Amino acid sequence: HDGFCLFDSKYTDFKSTNTKCGRDLVAEYVEAVRAEGLKVGLYFSLLDWFHDDFPHYGDRNHPMRNNPAYKNDDRDFDRYLTYMHNQVREICTNYGKLDVLWFDFSYDTLRGEAWKATELINMVRNLQPDVIIDNRLEVSGEGYGSLAAGNPTPYHGDFVSPEQMIPPNGIQDVNGNDIAWESCVTMNNHWGYCANDHFFKPAPMLIKKLVECVS
């Protein structure tokens, strides 16, 4: 959620092509994946802690959430949404056919139409009509959203995404119908780099979890 782009976005200088690396890592990734006959999936963080117009002070997750020096008086969230939508358009336009687009994530008041989610999902579906999208324009890993509630929104996505658990009996909606899901499980105890976290799950456990997901 730090806002650093691994692709060559024209809307920011905070990107891999503007470092000593000097490479569009997303372009290299999709090329390598397709060369092996695999499907292409991209992750996109709805949160951007680097962007000046994303809420800082008082936000539940922002690193500066408790620092009064980062109050939100001059921030323009609509300007941030324009920036974010433009970047989604870039990844849906510049990297060929996408098979999965994984948004992350919604919480508190930042969910659904706070992201202009209907407009965003319509743009994605227009540019990538066959893409599969997760449910995190409306929820996080803590819930399953309108897809499970039996009253799906226009931006509900195609599957739900529980975190750090594999549902033993799958997931059903309120009517008892099975719904598609993807389990998000870390290999250690953190989602990003953590120098002190050496508690990696052993290979047999990871293999077992993969088998459980597809069995």
Which residue stretches match the model-derived regions?
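Mature catalytic domains of secreted/periplasmic carbohydrate-active enzymes
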Residues: 1-215
